[in-house]
Amino acid sequence: MRAMDTQVQSAERGLVLPPMNSTVSSATAATTATNTDTDTDGDRDEERESLAEDGSEWVPAYMLTRDRSRYLGHFLGVDKMLEAVKCKYCGVIIRRQGNSISMAEASQTHLWSTHKIDPNANYYSGWTGVEAGSTFMVRPPLKNHQGGSATTNSIANLLEIDEDFLKRTREKEMALPLVQSLAIIIASENLPLSFVDNTAVRLLINQNANSLSFIDHDLILNAIRSIAYNLDRIIQRTALRNNSDLSLIIDKNYLLMDPTDRSNQLSNRLKNQLFEMQKINFFSLSHSVWNNTISILSIQYYDDFHSQVKTLPLIIQNLHEYNNDPKLSIPAQLLKISQELPGLQNTVISITLPRSQIVDLLNVMDSQPFFPNTYTNAKNYYHNCIISIINSAILPLFGTPKSADITHPRQSSFSKEPLTLLDSLIDLSNIDISNSIFSRINSFLDDLQSNSWQLDKFRSLCEKFGFEFVCSKFDLSRYSTATVSLQTFLNLRPIIEEYQSSIQIEKFNEIDFQIIDYLLITLNSINRILKFFTSSKSLNFTYVLFAIMSIEKHLLSTLGSLQFQRLIAPFETFLSKIQEFKTILFSDDMNLLAMFLCPAILFEREVLEYSFHTISLSEIVDKLSTSIFSLLKRFLNLHTIGNVNNSHNTSNHSNMNIHTDNQTNNINNRSGNNSDNNDNEHDNDNDNHSNSNTPASRIDIDPTGGENSVLPEQQPQNSNNNLSFGSLSDTHHLSDSTISKEIDSIFLQIIQEDLYDYLSTVNSIVPISYRSYCEQSNFIRDSGRFKKRIITEDSIIGELEQPMNFIEELLDIHVPVCNAFWSQYLDNDAGPIIRILFKIMQCQSSSSIRGEYSFLNDFIPRVHPDLTQEIIKIKLFNDQFVASKVDYDLDTLQTASQYLP
């Protein structure tokens, strides 16, 4: 071990203070940082930092994890899960708490709020005595390897030094970080380069850099190009880091010949590898086109640190420049990614595209595969964008498709306001609304505004009823105006009814207002779905099928109450489209797996039977185990080294070079314990299933309920890859294929154990969670449906019960309860398979369109016309990261996420 700089140790607490002069305050420590990783900077002595206390040995936290975040250098830990860390400065122990901020965020907040220490400061670097309370960081002077400081070498004093040259050099070094910051600001805000020519800006620059000579337009342009290039390199480094965590290396020199002992060895090694897999950043891709001008192929991943889904553009192309160019095709773009970012495809789970693109792509990619050919179902890789599905299905509510034989006048937008996110999601450009209620409303408002006498009369009626007249017409180019127009017109109903009684016009009757009401309720609910799936919320891929089924139920319920054909026909067409797409989505194995990880679905008997053709959860586990095995086996690169040592026996077990951890030690008994409990509650007729629309009772978890299903430890010998532990042959020659089969058998068992543990936990927690959530949020359940309890101030009325449609139930009740379940489950006893699956589902793109890109609706680059791609990349990165603190030469996506503003 390397020696660490002189340290001061507290006698009372035995804490190791930072390697600094005793006269320097802790506030001074906040000012020091370097741009290198914790494991390469400074000298350290881990033994002197270690602390034995209450039977636990506290060691430097960075030694327990592969995470190289600098804040870890300021803490001690006791286990590799880092359930608790001890501050080296004050001895405070920070523990992982459920349903709270992450451990990393809590630790960094403690450093800054308590000790005024920058979490990005390197604990092991040199400390510079600047003024206490200073908020900027100072790099320590370079050391002369022959002794002394580079600035005190006597030989240097004998040299003739060009003072002007040194001054210019120092000015340039001081200006470069400022140029980078200016480049980030200009690109992120889409400012013109003339921004830096502003007198106030240049005065501010001069005060910070003491020089203006190096701040010019070319320097900023080069900085923008450099940052954008380095963003791709950050993704590249992340991909390489992912690949390093994929190798499962088995040293046959240490394998025991006894089948049972060898099974335990391989099981522990595999569980260790699964623990490492949890650190991988899984990715998904998506493609979208904005404003019919900008094509973007983006990457999406889940940020563990902030519990947020983040997205970054990979390829940005101007459609006007590449009109009908083969470079715009999805296969060409995927090929470009695999060439420029080698290794990235190894951890890309899928790509999400509009339905029309997927149909074309599946026929092409067979000959040019981007994903490995391990799945028999290609739909596992190519997901349908739920936004494009809804867009295609909802069009009949607005009118009929425009005829190609008829020339329709091009409508200009009524509003000068910027386009909203909703405007970019639904395209109505090919819809003829002439026979719809929207056309009637627009005609009424046009006639009203064209006659000043009628307009004055209408406004006087508005004043009489206490309304302010606002002309809210439906703009075909702005989908968001649909609900605004309907709601405004509905609010004006009493005024309209009185007005039209004295005017000879086509009158709005009761049916018209009912149509408006039905449309408004449906469109408001659909808009909530659209916003949900374009947000950065994690787990929204898990709710894709749930959302489609909720829309279907809402439409069926609405059609059951409609009595006029004018609205029945478009709603039936809408429903038919949704049901067609539902069938397509159910053919996607990844969607089925995602639905299984939505706890509320497990209580829906009809849904389970439709999805898996059985209501037996044990049979469902058997089916899903195979899918999960195929999915995760792709990320287990098995490598065997060495030869079997025949002299090894059970006494040599301690020589096995395998490290178990606290998480994996408790897994082995889960399935057995859960199965014993579940057997006592088993009912062969499955009468315990809830047939209501909501989780009202326990689900029946029966590991032996399936015709061919048994518990993992009860599996008979299988001549194929699935070998039970008892069938491992006692041979003196273990081939690679034999070891691979044994690993596969153990892997399958771990998968099934975790799935049964998940079902058992859902069974015990979710029903209680629904009751608790409804009580706290004023929801009540009546005959399988939810209602909102509204408490009024009227003593006679008391409280009202407001019915909820199926979409409202999904977003207001099911999603919050399921999210709370996952937060609690992951903070406690979730197994490694479930944790990996959860992370994979979090990274999946449910929509090819994300809200973060909505600024592209009317985007025009102001920096430079040739830097559109670079500007978009930097803006999106800066919106989601602290771009000014990122080390573009060293950071990965994981480490870049941990910088605090």
UniProtKB/Swiss-Prot annotation:
Residues 1-54, 646-727 are annotated as: Disordered. Coiled coil: none annotated. Residues 1-10 have a biased composition (Polar residues). Residues 679-688 have a biased composition (Basic and acidic residues). It is a single-pass membrane protein. InterPro entries: RNaseH-like_sf (IPR012337), VID_Regulator (IPR052884), Znf_BED (IPR003656). SUPFAM superfamilies: Ribonuclease H-like. Residues 27-37, 646-677, 718-727 have a biased composition (Low complexity). The chain crosses the membrane at residues 381-401. One of its GO terms (molecular function) is G-quadruplex DNA binding. Glycans are attached at N21, N242, N291, N540, N645, N649, N652, N662, N669, N673, N688, N722. Zn(2+) binds at C87, C90, H110, H115. A zinc finger (BED-type) spans 66-122. Its main location: membrane. It is found in: Cell membrane; Nucleus. One of its GO terms (biological process) is protein catabolic process in the vacuole. Glycosylated. Belongs to the VID22 family. PANTHER family: ORGANELLAR PROTEIN, PUTATIVE-RELATED-RELATED (PTHR35261), VACUOLAR IMPORT AND DEGRADATION PROTEIN 22 (PTHR35261:SF3). Has a role in the negative regulation of gluconeogenesis. Imports fructose-1,6-bisphosphatase (FBPase) into the intermediate vacuole import and degradation (Vid) vesicles. This is an indirect role and requires cyclophilin A. This is Vacuolar import and degradation protein 22. It comes from Saccharomyces cerevisiae (strain ATCC 204508 / S288c) (Baker's yeast).
